[in-house]
């Protein structure tokens, strides 16, 4: 059986030759050069992904939602009861949550995965990858052992690769877990080197008079656990959570197949920061869907070097932003594959070149 290190070493580089061919093709389409803006750049990025074989296209679409509880909830960093995690996970199996509705609109399947919900028995209808009944309280102990983090990463990577074998070419990540913006902020603070007060936000409507406590909890977690910012697994194990580990696994798994993965909001940025520490080669496969309204979002995205496509003032999580952005990926593929070419028309535009997919 492959180890985590083995799988990380399989992540292919983006193909610059394929991107150059795509650039020439797009410049020769029936439009002024660059007039479709970031849609053109996105199509070129997709063309460079080996899993798409040089031609931007979308097959099956999947949003993987990682569900877990967090011991740090006990510190009063969230106003929602912890039981909401399990209740909302059940609602996802019925297709009634935000991500389910948006994914259905986009023609994507939602995979609801229990990686650490705090219930006595597994919840029917969920994919069971549960490691434990919630992570440790990061204010007083590590979130999990390194072994637990590595095993979950490996399990999710393998599951993601199986979905790719079955025709999924576009992945989205999502999460569900009360209090999970606290470990996410701890990860962002650790890896970016920014102070907790710069990255800790209100999450799911935390009253502002409780924000100081949340900031203090993040600071205590980092001081106590001393995560190594250069070691993504160490950061996830010490101040993360099972849902964050799971999302990182999806990113690594998709990238190992040479396929794109749409980020969601703040939680996914934190997971991406950790995943990129494990393998910087995954970064070109990460596509930022939207700008989260959570404080610290810009800091995390800036560190990743990513600019989101949408700014809808969203902070639901669940993978809702990833699902919402899937039609943008399809639009980039459509202009690449379906637009006419200047060479076949009577139009001559300064700066345009003849399309050539074979040179």
Curated annotation (Swiss-Prot):
The annotated active site, in chain numbering, is 318
The record's keywords, sorted A to Z, are: Cobalamin biosynthesis, Glycosyltransferase, Transferase
InterPro entries given for it?
Nict_dMeBzImd_PRibTrfase, Nict_dMeBzImd_PRibTrfase_bact, Nict_dMeBzImd_PRibTrfase_N, Nict_dMeBzImd_PRibTrfase_sf
* Pathway connected to this protein: Nucleoside biosynthesis; alpha-ribazole biosynthesis; alpha-ribazole from 5,6-dimethylbenzimidazole: step 1/2
Record's keyword annotation contains Glycosyltransferase: yes
Broad class of enzyme this protein falls into:
transferase
EC numbers listed for it are: 2.4.2.21
Q: What does this protein do?
A: Catalyzes the synthesis of alpha-ribazole-5'-phosphate from nicotinate mononucleotide (NAMN) and 5,6-dimethylbenzimidazole (DMB).
Share what the entry says about its subunit structure, partners included.
Homodimer.
Family, similarity comment: Belongs to the CobT family.
Name recorded for this polypeptide: Nicotinate-nucleotide--dimethylbenzimidazole phosphoribosyltransferase
**Gene this protein is translated from:** cobT
């Amino acid at each position: 059986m492959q180890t985590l290190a083995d799988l990380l070493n399989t992540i292919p580089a983006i193909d610059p030759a394929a991107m150059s061919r795509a650039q020439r093709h797009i410049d020769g389409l029936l439009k002024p050069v660059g007039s479709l803006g970031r849609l053109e750049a996105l199509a070129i990025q997709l063309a460079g992904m080996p899993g798409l074989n040089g031609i931007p296209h979308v097959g099956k679409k999947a949003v993987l939602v990682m569900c877990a509880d967090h011991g740090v909830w006990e510190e009063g960093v969230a106003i929602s009861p912890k039981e909401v995690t399990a209740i909302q996970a059940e609602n996802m199996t019925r297709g009634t949550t935000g991500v389910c509705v948006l994914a259905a609109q986009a023609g994507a399947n939602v995979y609801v995965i229990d990686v650490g919900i705090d219930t006595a028995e597994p919840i029917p209808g969920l994919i069971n990858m549960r490691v434990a009944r919630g992570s440790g309280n990061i204010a007083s102990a590590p979130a999990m052992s390194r072994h637990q983090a590595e095993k979950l990463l490996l399990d999710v990577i393998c599951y993601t690769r199986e979905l790719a074998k079955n025709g999924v070419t576009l992945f989205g990540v999502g999460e569900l877990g009360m209090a999970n913006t606290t470990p996410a902020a701890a990860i962002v603070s650790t890896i970016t080197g920014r102070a907790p007060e710069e990255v800790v936000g209100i999450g799911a409507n935390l009253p502002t008079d409780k924000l100081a406590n949340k900031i203090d909890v993040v600071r205590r977690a980092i001081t106590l656990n001393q995560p190594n910012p250069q070691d993504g697994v160490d950061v996830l194990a010490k101040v993360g959570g099972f849902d964050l580990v799971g999302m990182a696994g999806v990113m690594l798994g998709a990238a190992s197949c040479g396929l794109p993965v749409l980020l969601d909001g703040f939680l996914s940025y934190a997971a991406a920061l950790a995943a990129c520490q494990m393998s910087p080669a995954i970064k070109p496969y990460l596509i930022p869907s939207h700008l989260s309204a959570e404080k610290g979002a810009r800091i995390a995205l800036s560190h990743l070097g990513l600019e989101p496509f949408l700014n809808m003032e969203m902070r639901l999580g669940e993978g809702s932003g990833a699902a919402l952005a899937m039609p943008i990926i399809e639009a980039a593929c459509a202009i690449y594959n379906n637009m006419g070419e200047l060479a076949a028309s009577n139009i001559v535009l300064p700066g345009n070149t003849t399309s050539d997919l074979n040179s």
